[in-house]
Structures are given as C-alpha cells and as structure tokens.
Amino acid sequence: MSDAAVDTSSEITTKDLKEKKEVVEEAENGRDAPANGNAQNEENGEQEADNEVDEEEEEGGEEEEEEEEGDGEEEDGDEDEEAEAPTGKRVAEDDEDDDVDTKKQKTEEDD
C-alpha cells in the first residue's frame, strides 16, 4: 500500500514539473502555446506555418545530402577531424594509466 502512495506522489511531482516547464516556455516564447504542442485553432496559425517551413527545409536537406555524396573530398575532411578528437582523448586516458602503473611499480620495488 505504501508503494502505491509513493507512486502517486511522484506522478503529481512530474505533472507539476511539466506544468512549470510549459509556463516557462510560454514566457520565453512570448505567446501562449497549446499544452499538447499541436496547433488546433487560428490563434496558433504561426505554429502551423512553422511546421510547413520545417517540411520545406527537410526536403531541401535531402537534396544537400545527395550533393555531398558526390563530393568525396569534403566527406574525407570531416571524417579526419572527427577521428582526431577521440584519438586525443585516448592519449590522455593512456597517460593516466601510465601514472597508475608507475605507482604500482614503486610499491612493488619497496616491498
């Protein structure tokens, strides 16, 4: 029984947080947005227009992807940059491991 009470209180907390988040978003946007995020009346026509623009951008994005496939040089350049970043991190991690090994060796020598 006490478990059910805990679940109910956590649900209320979640709902409260969602409501607060919506209020903050409305204040930031400077306009009232529907709670469900869907534009259902004329007052929210701006959201409908935004959705149409997003669809157009998505269509344009597909064309850009096709163009990028033809240019192998650009893709290779991007991949090189991405490959360098993780390598640098690995080097730092290896340095830390070396420090630990050094400490272990000193301990073994002392014994």
From Swiss-Prot:
InterPro entries: Pro/parathymosin. It is found in: Nucleus. Residues 1-111 are annotated as: Disordered. Keywords: Acetylation, Isopeptide bond, Nucleus, Phosphoprotein, Ubl conjugation. The modification N-acetylmethionine is found at residue 1. The keyword Chloroplast does not apply. It comes from the Eukaryota. There is a cross-link at residue 103 (Glycyl lysine isopeptide (Lys-Gly) (interchain with G-Cter in SUMO2)). The keyword Transport does not apply. The modification Phosphothreonine is found at residues 8, 13-14, 102, 107. The modification N6-acetyllysine is found at residues 15, 103. One of its GO terms (cellular component) is cytosol. The modification N6-succinyllysine is found at residue 15. Residues 43-84 have a biased composition (Acidic residues). GO terms for molecular function: DNA-binding transcription factor binding; histone binding; histone chaperone activity. Covalently linked to a small RNA of about 20 nucleotides. The modification N-acetylserine is found at residue 2. One of its GO terms (biological process) is chromatin organization. The modification Phosphoserine is found at residues 2, 9-10. Its main location: nucleus. Residues 13-31, 101-111 have a biased composition (Basic and acidic residues). Interacts with NUPR1; regulates apoptotic process. PANTHER family: PROTHYMOSIN ALPHA. Belongs to the pro/parathymosin family. Prothymosin alpha may mediate immune function by conferring resistance to certain opportunistic infections. This is Prothymosin alpha. The gene is Ptma.
